Amino acid sequence: MGRKKIQITRIMDERNRQVTFTKRKFGLMKKAYELSVLCDCEIALIIFNSSNKLFQYASTDMDKVLLKYTEYNEPHESRTNSDIVEALNKKEHRGCDSPDPDTSYVLTPHTEEKYKKINEEFDNMMRNHKIAPGLPPQNFSMSVTVPVTSPSALSYTNPGSSLVSPSLAASSALADTSMLSPPQATLHRNVSPGAPQRPPSTGSAGGMLSTSDLTVPNGAGSSPVGNGFVNSRASPNLIGTTGANSLGKVMPTKSPPPPGGGSLGMNSRKPDLRVVIPPSSKGMMPPLNTQRISSSQATQPLATPVVSVTTPSLPPQGLVYSAMPTAYNTDYSLTSADLSALQGFNSPGMLSLGQVSAWQQHHLGQAALNSLVAGGQLSQGSNLSINTNQNINIKSEPISPPRDRMTPSGFQQQQQPQPPPPPPQAPQPQPRQEVGRSPVDSLSSSSSSYDGSDREDPRGDFHSPVVLGRPPNSEDRESPSVKRMRMDAWVT
């Protein structure tokens, strides 16, 4: 849209006329300058305004131009206003500087057809240009690796919805296991997609985490998040699940019981520890305050291998290990005393006994546990069995006094006789864990009645930090804490 054309008549307003004169006078001189330079000609411009004031312009020297003008006697073109107006009206060159006829400005049927064709081609080009960017996304596919957790993933809410992780829910869209295949031999707790599918836990008692709270896919199936061990790597996670009526027992070291399994296990030696434990299933412990999870600790990844070996549907009261043997080989049946004796272990591969009813029916993939249990391996089978091809001094009697043993991994073991389970008691608040504790040491049974009786005072003889991991293919890949089996054939 061009500028509005004014009517070429005398301007009546004095002020407007003066402004228009100043602007157009300069424009005229500018055009004269351009013409003189472009066409190599001499121009002399003489202007008298309405008050007889002189304004002149000369491309070179006014006197020379005027002298040449006066001495010129040849026929030449001379025009006045009437000539210009007549030329403009006749040739319909309105607004054109030159009165000469120019066929390019005349719209003939041929030129109109040519312009229409140009416009159509331009419209087609613009239409194709707009559609082209939209085509590649329609046929484009890219594998995306979504981190399992984010620094803001560990948010603790009421006991009914224990852990809420937006990144975990976001990873549910990645069903292809090839997108989520992590490295196997790293020391990060990356779990390969070979982990079998585990249906959610069934029981929920006393306001514990139910199966509808959070379900995380691990490439081949889903498992509920229970005891708060969240894998912060970009891989499908093998999370130790603790149901409402299940165990949160931790094997590594003896220590005073955390309040109903509702405290955080913070190891000051492991600044990258992140552990959150659900409150007691019996309703005796109020939910954790979110202030208990400091930002510096909540944003750190796990640095300790954690395996949660789950048991099928344990009752909320009574002997907590009663249903344990049903998930494993009957050749290695375990009693509650045997399992209780496992508490004295100090080993790099911790064993957290949780509960999810589906693990008794599926394989624990060897590849899925190599990167979780540092140096520890669970042989694959329909029932969880133990590879006993090395000399591990792990024989224990439930009623024997405490005695020191040395495992192949160099960690000192202590056995503790287990008293009969006392009645459930209200948990007591506990300060931060001591330095020598392992990252998963703060786990306790969510619904167990061993809350206050199966742990000793904080240990001072934990003289070795938790080993992050050994090569999965080494000779010493079996961790003594993978399973404490009652086998009299194993000599001490």
From Swiss-Prot:
Compositional bias ranges of the Polar residues kind: 209-227, 382-394
Residue span of region Required for interaction with MAPKs: 266-283
UniProt keyword annotations, A-Z: Acetylation, Activator, Apoptosis, Developmental protein, Differentiation, DNA-binding, Isopeptide bond, Neurogenesis, Nucleus, Phosphoprotein, Transcription, Transcription regulation, Ubl conjugation
Record PTM text: Constitutive phosphorylation on Ser-400 promotes Lys-395 sumoylation thus preventing acetylation at this site. Dephosphorylation on Ser-400 by PPP3CA upon neuron depolarization promotes a switch from sumoylation to acetylation on residue Lys-395 leading to inhibition of dendrite claw differentiation. Phosphorylation on Thr-304 and Thr-311 are the main sites involved in p38 MAPK signaling and activate transcription. Phosphorylated on these sites by MAPK14/p38alpha and MAPK11/p38beta, but not by MAPK13/p38delta nor by MAPK12/p38gamma. Sumoylation on Lys-395 is enhanced by PIAS1 and represses transcriptional activity. Phosphorylation on Ser-400 is required for sumoylation. Has no effect on nuclear location nor on DNA binding. Sumoylated with SUMO1 and, to a lesser extent with SUMO2 and SUMO3. PIASx facilitates sumoylation in postsynaptic dendrites in the cerebellar cortex and promotes their morphogenesis.
Residues where Phosphothreonine is found: T304, T311, T407
SMART domains the UniProt entry points to: MADS
GO cellular component: chromatin; cytosol; nucleoplasm; nucleus; transcription regulator complex
Site keyed Cleavage: positions: D176, T177, D213, L214, D451, G452
GO biological process, one term: cellular response to calcium ion
Residue numbers spanned by region Disordered: 183-227, 242-270, 382-492
Biased composition, class Pro residues, residue ranges: 417-430
Covalent link (Glycyl lysine isopeptide (Lys-Gly) (interchain with G-Cter in SUMO)) residue numbers: K395
Modified residues (Phosphoserine): S59, S98, S235, S255, S347, S400, S438
Main location: nucleus
DNA-binding interval(s): 58-86
Compositionally skewed regions (Basic and acidic residues) per UniProt: 452-462, 473-492
Protein name: Myocyte-specific enhancer factor 2A
